[in-house]
Amino acid sequence: DNSYKVSGGLHGVSVSVVNALSSKLHLMISRAGQVHEQEYQHGDPQYPLRVIGETDKSGTTVRFWPSELTFTQTIFNVEILARRLRELSFLNAGVRIVLRDERINLEHVYDYEGGLSEFVKYINEGKTHLNEIFHFTADTDSGIGVEVALQWNESYQENVRCFTNNIPQKDGGSHLAGFRAALTRGLNQYLENENILKKEKVNVTGDDAREGLTAIISVKVPDPKFSSQTKEKLVSSEVKPAVEQAMNKEFSAYLLENPQAAKSIAGKIIDAARARDAARKAREMTRRKSALDIAGLPGKLADCQEKDPALSELYLVEGDSAGGSAKQGRNRKMQAILPLKGKILNVERARFDKMISSQEVGTLITALGCGIGREEYNPDKLRYHKII
């Protein structure tokens, strides 16, 4: 009975749906010393459940053949299966999962004793980390199980994944809200206690604290509630305080017991806060420059006469020399030319403040006309519908 206290409610529905959409489904169940068998065709049982032997094992084997009457394509994508089974192995430490693709004689074995710690390690592979992985499990008074693993790295992106009873929530929910609240509170408390905020003269936000963070949040909830049938957001209100309380206790202790890691994390947060402030100033400067330019357009841009974006084209060319040739050969009515330096900046590896302070990037932003930042960016304002 304990096996189903924190189920996701998907297993019963799924086997019913698979059965209905299969030309054949075969069940073999080993239980209580006996092996039981039943077979279905297009959802209809071919005979009652029957005993076919004895065993000292327990478990269920399900084999199914997708119906070609229903599906036009019945090819299984092994990469999708591998990704999900690997994920399940991380979420259930010590569970061994074997995936065999007999079409190409391929076998994957997933067995992660470290659970979520190994999940974070897998995601952060190849990245420079700032602290050893922080990992804890807790059973709360409300009957909710909480497990969290996290680590900061030198990247600038936040990567937090949430799960409820092994089901992923790409839109987060109450477990993510509790985690973020506890994380921000714990880090702010540490920064204040160490007098870092006054010393560095910066204001820190939750976004600053989560820059470069990789985290996995897994909760086990007896009766979870989701925002939709696809279970992409957890809305159980009792989960937030459970996660927040457990995370607050464990993470605060971690920062106190690991001063070197705490110092590295604090340094990362201060850098992120400064970069955010620098980006804000650069953004304002870009806006002011745009307002002062004639018609708000960069000087190097040779604009076209056409005002309808759907009929306008922008050609990005490398260097003034190529720009001159392009301007001579263009159709002035519909083709605009913007000369830029080659290899201006790898924006995937650069912080936002560095990106926005680049003259070439600023010129490009102004020419396109969409604006920058979460609050201002509007693709409907794009001045050219064809960019080459």
From Swiss-Prot:
Identification of the protein by name: DNA gyrase subunit B
Site (Interaction with DNA): residue numbering on this chain: K343, N346
Subcellular location: Cytoplasm
GO cellular component terms listed in the entry, alphabetical order: cytoplasm
InterPro entries (UniProt xref): HATPase_C_sf, Ribosomal_Su5_D2-typ_SF, Ribsml_uS5_D2-typ_fold_subgr, Topo_IIA, Topo_IIA-like_dom_sf, Topo_IIA_B, Topo_IIA_B_C, Topo_IIA_bsu_dom2
Top-level enzyme category: isomerase
Domain Toprim: residue ranges: 312-388
GO BP of this protein: DNA topological change
Highest taxon, organism lineage: Bacteria
Protein source organism: Acinetobacter calcoaceticus
UniProt entry tagged with the keyword Ribonucleoprotein: no
Subunit structure of this chain's protein: Heterotetramer, composed of two GyrA and two GyrB chains. In the heterotetramer, GyrA contains the active site tyrosine that forms a transient covalent intermediate with DNA, while GyrB binds cofactors and catalyzes ATP hydrolysis.
EC numbers: 5.6.2.2
Protein family (similarity comment): Belongs to the type II topoisomerase GyrB family.
Underlying gene: gyrB
Keyword DNA-binding: yes
Keywords attached to this entry: ATP-binding, Cytoplasm, DNA-binding, Isomerase, Nucleotide-binding, Topoisomerase
Record-level Gene Ontology MF annotations: ATP binding; DNA binding; DNA topoisomerase type II (double strand cut, ATP-hydrolyzing) activity
Catalysed reactions, as listed in the record: ATP-dependent breakage, passage and rejoining of double-stranded DNA
Described purpose of this protein according to its UniProt entry: A type II topoisomerase that negatively supercoils closed circular double-stranded (ds) DNA in an ATP-dependent manner to modulate DNA topology and maintain chromosomes in an underwound state. Negative supercoiling favors strand separation, and DNA replication, transcription, recombination and repair, all of which involve strand separation. Also able to catalyze the interconversion of other topological isomers of dsDNA rings, including catenanes and knotted rings. Type II topoisomerases break and join 2 DNA strands simultaneously in an ATP-dependent manner.
Further comment: Few gyrases are as efficient as E.coli at forming negative supercoils. Not all organisms have 2 type II topoisomerases; in organisms with a single type II topoisomerase this enzyme also has to decatenate newly replicated chromosomes.
